[in-house]
UniProtKB/Swiss-Prot annotation:
GO terms for cellular component: acetyl-CoA carboxylase complex. GO terms for molecular function: acetyl-CoA carboxylase activity; ATP binding; carboxyl- or carbamoyltransferase activity. Residues 38-293 form the CoA carboxyltransferase C-terminal domain. Its EC number is 2.1.3.15. Keywords: ATP-binding, Cytoplasm, Fatty acid biosynthesis, Fatty acid metabolism, Lipid biosynthesis, Lipid metabolism, Nucleotide-binding, Transferase. It comes from Stenotrophomonas maltophilia (strain K279a). Acetyl-CoA carboxylase is a heterohexamer composed of biotin carboxyl carrier protein (AccB), biotin carboxylase (AccC) and two subunits each of ACCase subunit alpha (AccA) and ACCase subunit beta (AccD). It is found in: Cytoplasm. The lineage of its organism: Bacteria, Pseudomonadati, Pseudomonadota, Gammaproteobacteria, Lysobacterales. This is Acetyl-coenzyme A carboxylase carboxyl transferase subunit alpha. The keyword DNA repair does not apply. Signal peptide: none annotated. The gene is accA. Coiled coil: none annotated.
Length: 319
């Protein structure tokens, strides 16, 4: 099976292989298979739509983790006119799991900050698999405070399995760094738009996730823990991760129905990795619309609405 296809995409892979075989055959003399190719292409479109209409939470998670899914760096290349990366937390080190800096989107100056995973083994190690340490979150906060000083909106791109849980991170105050970001982002005097582009794992994601708007890509996920971790804790069996994924309610439509996500951005057929450029253009349009809406608010209105938004989470009515 083509490694770019997930298990549940096997019927799609088979049809695409047949189409390719026919195209190769048509290269010979006096062979015309266009009618058959068109018929298979129609069948492929219908089968793909059918599969992606009925995805389970576990299958959505596999798409969110797809090795070819666009990362922060990929969106930076397509969505922004300019990007100047800024490094370091000015206290300990530069954490490569977080990248951020000054950018322009349609000529508008913004501060962009996001998790960054790696493609190959070398880059994965360099980026620590997209799992930040305290210095990463402190770098992010430094850039947010800089944005506040210059009156720049903050755009965050969330894609992490979680904060790094190593002893080195704990000894440098991992929990404090995350908590500090939550406090400071709640009070930052500039617009903040948070977008979950892949995995949104626990506090490691939330440390870039407090803002005025939360946007989520169609096949991204957002939860307090990974399904594997949840299954290990609840049932002492990581093999029950599929069941945990359903119970966690980690998909974009589910979170939007709960009021935790403001907008879900539709992905290209087959997921963002099938057409990263189209995905980036769709997300760019959404972010520009949200920036325009937030620009109309005064600082006082912005903070009041953000406070009310945060206070609304977790409310319930007694029976």
């Amino acid at each position: 099976m083509n490694p770019n296809y997930l298990d549940f995409e096997q019927p799609i892979a088979d049809l695409e292989a047949k189409i390719q075989e026919l195209r190769n055959a048509s290269a010979g003399p006096a062979v015309n298979v266009e009618a058959e190719v068109h018929a298979l292409q129609d069948k492929l479109r219908m089968r793909t739509a059918q599969i992606f209409r009925n995805l389970t939470s576990w299958q959505v998670l596999q798409l969110a983790r797809h090795p070819s899914r666009p990362y922060t760096a990929d969106y930076l290349r397509v969505m922004f006119d300019e990007f100047q990366e800024l490094a370091g937390d000015r206290a300990f080190a530069d954490d490569k799991a977080i990248m951020g800096g000054l950018a322009r989107i349609n000529g508008r100056a913004v501060m962009v900050i996001g998790h960054q995973k790696g493609r190959d083994t070398k880059e994965k190690i360099k980026r620590n698999f997209g799992m930040p340490k305290p210095e990463g979150y402190r770098k992010a906060l430094r850039l947010m405070k800089m944005a506040e000083r210059f009156g720049l909106p903050v755009l965050t791109l969330i894609d992490t399995a979680g904060a790094w849980p190593g002893i080195d991170a704990e000894s440098r105050g991992q929990s404090e760094a995350i908590a500090r970001n939550l406090i400071e982002m709640a009070e930052l005097k500039v617009p903040i738009i948070c977008t979950v582009i892949g995995e949104g794992g626990s506090g490691g994601a939330l440390a870039l996730g407090v803002g005025d708007r939360t946007v989520m890509l169609e096949y991204a996920v957002y939860s307090t823990i990974t399904p594997e971790g949840c299954a290990s804790i609840l049932w002492k069996d990581a093999g029950k991760a599929k069941d945990a994924a359903e119970q966690l309610g980690l998909t974009a439509p589910r979170l939007k129905s709960l009021g935790l996500v403001d907008k879900v951005v539709r992905e290209p057929t087959g997921g963002a990795h099938r057409n990263p450029t189209q995905m980036a253009k769709r997300l760019k349009a959404v972010l520009l619309n949200e920036l325009d809406a937030l620009d109309k608010l005064s600082t006082e209105q912005l903070l009041e609405q953000r406070y009310a938004r945060l206070r609304s989470y977790g409310t319930y009515e007694a029976a």
